[in-house]
Design a protein with these regions (language model features):
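Basic, helix-initiating cap at the start of DNA-binding domains
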Residues: 1-22, 26-38, 52
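Hydrophobic alpha-helical segments typical of transmembrane helices
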Residues: 7, 28, 57, 69, ...
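A general structural signal for well-ordered alpha-helical segments in protein cores
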Residues: 29, 50, 54, 83, ...
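Residue-level detection of the helix-turn-helix DNA-binding "recognition helix"
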Residues: 34, 48-49, 59
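Short hydrophobic/aromatic patch on the recognition helix
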Residues: 37-47
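Alpha-helical DNA-contacting segments of helix-turn-helix folds
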Residues: 54-61
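Hydrophobic alpha-helical connector segments
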Residues: 56, 70-100
Length: 105
């Protein structure tokens, strides 16, 4: 992974953490820049707008949800075992979000 992509990934990770605390609507280039100890223009250069930053955060949130909840459940046999795994994974994720915050609340 190139340095620019590593930086962008780190920004998205920090922005996701921030968004779980303040909500996606409160997420701004300035707030993320402060957390990352970067200039606003440095963060802006990776996304081009506040909206693109927010979209990247939502995509990352959904990607992590799929990795932690959906894909592991799909390894289970069809039917009730898969449904039980999906529910168990979802509840595990939800209880972790109680401590860290949920992106949408």
């Amino acid at each position: 992974m190139q340095k620019g992509q590593q930086t962008k990934s780190a920004i998205v990770d920090a922005a996701l953490g921030l968004a779980t605390q303040i909500g996606i609507e409160g997420l701004s280039i300035g707030a993320v820049a402060e957390v990352m100890q970067m200039s606003k223009s440095g963060v802006f250069a990776h996304f081009g707008s506040r909206e693109e930053l927010q979209i990247s955060v939502v995509r990352e949130y959904h990607h992590r949800f799929e990795l932690e909840v959906f894909y592991p459940a799909m390894q289970e046999p069809r039917g009730l075992p898969r449904l039980q795994a999906l529910f168990a994974n979802w509840m595990k994720r939800t209880s972790a979000e109680i401590d860290s915050g949920c992106l949408y609340i």
